[in-house]
Amino acid sequence: MAELLAIKWDDNRDKLILLDQTILPNKIEYIEYDTAEDVYDSIKDMIVRGAPAIGVTAAYGLYFAAKVAPEDNFKNFFKYLKEKSAYLDSSRPTAVNLSWALKIMESKALENKDKDVKEIKSILREEAKRIHEEDIEICKAIGENLVTLLKDGVGILTHCNAGQLATSKYGTATSPMYLAKEKGWNFKVYSDETRPRLQGSTLTALELYEAGIDVTTITDNMAAMVMSQGKIDAVIVGCDRIAANGDTANKIGTMGVSILAKYFGIPMYIAAPTPSIDIDTKTGKDIPIEERNPEEVTSRFGVWTAPRGVKVYNPGFDVTPHENITAIVTEKGIVYPPFEENLKKLFEK
């Protein structure tokens, strides 16, 4: 099978091409986008998902908005751009990469406010492409730092999908797995199914399996059993937002995995691009948690799995307390506790 990439850019036709992740692993289909409104829908409906991939997608979305923005003067152009930026930012509130990418695009426009609006539009096009390329470099660097914490023969547990399908390439949590394979290591990955959207089984297992990596899918409630059997040496997950104190928002179920890892004395590593670290958010209590459609819990593949009308609580994310985390691994280096102090130092480098 050809390499699965979540995001592609067609430079000749000025189109964003996204892998439809809602139908994996049964079908592999790509959808083309060229409007901010359609990009909004792609993020909201989880055709594209994963904090880094969402950020890159939003940057292209704001470029599409810029293409049709007023050209009479910068004031009207930027007013329109700000409105569309807020619109795109509302698509999924938990992933900080979304607002990060949009702010970069806004800042780039402001930096060039004295130029002709048509020229600014071209500049924003190149900036979106730069954000895309930078994400690839960040993911590879995270993997290079993470692999130093592992060794040949390691057993790894991961939750949700912080893989190549959640980023522009390599992934964050999966990046060291690809690099370990390149080194010829013999290792095993256990991928939590990740209810209710099943990203662990439909996405992580798919991409690792296609890459020839030894991966075993387990249901979420099997994690404790696998840990108790000594099969797990490290837990590696991604993140959607990290607060200043190290509290980490990630896919629902991650907090439970961290509690189990702490009980069994297994290191818990967060693979984190620095854009996912939100120093302005003091603790996990300040992170907004998206609540999703109840039918994600009560039905699957067109079949009801619970009584119709039953009450449902369906948060998309939970927050792992910083005290359960062994290290936060970024493209700039490995951050150990105390996180509040050391995360600040990271941004001073």
Swiss-Prot record:
Transmembrane segments: none annotated. Its EC number is 5.3.1.-. GO terms for molecular function: S-methyl-5-thioribose-1-phosphate isomerase activity. One of its GO terms (biological process) is pentose catabolic process. Pfam families: IF-2B. Keywords: Carbohydrate metabolism, Isomerase. The keyword DNA-binding does not apply. Signal peptide: none annotated. Pathway: Carbohydrate degradation. The record marks 160 as: Transition state stabilizer. InterPro entries: Deoxyribose1P_isomerase_DrdI, IF-2B-related, IF-M1Pi, IF_2B-like_C, Initiation_fac_2B_a/b/d, M1Pi_N, NagB/RpiA_transferase-like. It comes from the Bacteria. The active site is at residue 240. Substrate binds at residues 49-51, 92, 199, 250-251. It catalyses: 5-deoxy-alpha-D-ribose 1-phosphate = 5-deoxy-D-ribulose 1-phosphate. Catalyzes the isomerization of 5-deoxy-alpha-D-ribose 1-phosphate to 5-deoxy-D-ribulose 1-phosphate, as part of a 5-deoxyribose salvage pathway that recycles this toxic radical SAM enzyme by-product to mainstream metabolites. Belongs to the EIF-2B alpha/beta/delta subunits family. DrdI subfamily. This is 5-deoxyribose 1-phosphate isomerase. It comes from Clostridium botulinum (strain Loch Maree / Type A3). The gene is drdI.
